Design a protein with these regions (language model features):
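Ligand-binding "clamshell"
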Residues: 112-122, 127-142, 222-224, 236-250
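C-terminal motif of bacterial Sec signal peptides marking the signal peptidase cleavage site
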Residues: 24-27
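A bilobed periplasmic-binding-protein/Venus flytrap-type ligand-binding module shared by bacterial periplasmic
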Residues: 151-161, 256-269
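Paired acidic/hydrophobic, glycine-rich loop segments that form the ligand-binding mouth/hinge
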Residues: 99-103, 225-231
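An extracytoplasmic/periplasmic, membrane-proximal ligand-sensing/linker region
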Residues: 58, 185-191, 197, 202, ...
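Bacterial N-terminal signal peptides that target proteins for export
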Residues: 1-18
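Bacterial signal peptide processing site
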Residues: 29-32
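Bilobed "Venus flytrap"/periplasmic-binding protein-like clamshell domains
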Residues: 46-78, 146-218, 222, 301-305
């Protein structure tokens, strides 16, 4: 599970930490300054569809893209960018405090079911299982995009050339003299260090934890670590000096971007809402997401400006003039 998509804290404990923020969101939904008990029937002022993101730039970018597309379809929208970690956003969705969240298939399913019982690299199977898991809260899973953001095993170009590395299985002959850098929770996540041991037989010489993805990128470039776990759409992968190794034994789950929407919002806005999000998903690719992440995270572009530009390039929003 990507560090950009998970906090590493136990779900129940983190939920308790997030309760004040949920109460504030409920107050915003009710249009008053007082907290209200969150409930499935809460609605945004004016019937606006609330589109929320997790607290990292790529999620904000996706929420802005979907939100602007929905607004262009004539539906009132309120964007809640950087709402918080998964432990806040998931309960807010379940309780009807937000209406649309751009999710990641595998991570969303693992949040709800610790043992999903499906072949996780299969997007169709993961989507069906996620739909079943969200059904009790009347939340529907829309059509996934081709775009994915998975855990990626990354080395510098110099290391790849020196050791002849192209795919993750190539590391097996050299891992014993290499240091891996990852998020603190990598030691426990099934798709991180335990999975690399079990599926690929990798026994690294050492492991160094880093709290943020930029710290791991810096450590990799400076030679503090030899291998790093990064998101496959990390904007730094577009700079040319880092190499993403192919997951040739399919350790990582399907992590297609997929909008999840409350049944209440779909009942109110029907085909207009579904059509708006499906139009985005039909054209969103991993390469496009990588480029936009580079623009936002490395080049310093604004999230909303980049979202607007992507929608214009793909004919969803009209170009100016």
């Amino acid at each position: 599970m990507s560090a950009r998509r998970a906090t590493g804290r136990p779900y129940a404990a983190a939920f308790a930490v997030c309760l004040p923020a949920l109460a504030l969101l409920a107050a915003c939904q009710s249009g008053t300054g007082q907290s209200t008990a969150p409930g499935r029937g809460a609605t945004a002022p004016g019937g606006a569809v609330v589109v929320a993101s997790f607290n990292f730039p790529e999620s904000e970018l996706l929420a802005a893209i979907y939100g602007l597309a929905i607004r262009h379809a004539g539906i009132p929208v309120r964007l809640e960018l950087d709402l918080g970690p998964r432990e806040l956003v998931q309960p807010a969705l379940e309780q009807g405090l937000v209406d649309v969240v751009p999710e990641y298939l595998g991570t969303a399913l693992r949040t709800l079911e610790s043992r999903p019982g499906v072949l996780m690299p299969d997007p169709a199977a993961v989507r069906a299982a996620l739909a079943r898991a969200l059904a009790p809260w009347h939340v529907q899973v829309m059509t996934p995009a081709a775009a994915q953001d998975q855990n990626g095993i990354v080395v510098t170009g110099a290391t790849a050339r020196r050791l002849g590395l192209h795919k993750v299985s190539d590391l097996r002959r050299v891992a014993g003299r290499l240091t891996l850098g990852g998020s603190p929770e990598c030691t426990d996540r099934p798709y991180c260090l335990p999975g690399l041991r079990k599926v690929y037989g990798l026994g690294f010489a050492g492991f160094l934890p880093f709290g943020t993805e930029p710290e791991r990128v810096t450590a990799l470039r400076e030679g503090v670590v030899d291998v790093a776990v990064l998101d496959t759409t990390d904007g730094n992968l577009a700079t040319g000096d880092l190499v993403l190794l192919s997951d040739d034994r399919h350790l990582q789950p399907a992590e297609n971007v997929v909008p999840v929407i409350t049944g209440r919002a779909l009942a109110r806005y029907g085909k207009r809402l579904a059509g708006a999000v499906n139009a985005v998903s039909a054209q969103l690719t991993s390469q496009a997401l990588l480029f936009m992440d580079w623009r936002v995270e490395v080049a310093g572009a604004g999230v909303r400006a980049e979202a607007h530009a992507w929608l214009e390039r793909h004919g969803i929003l009209p170009r100016p003039g």
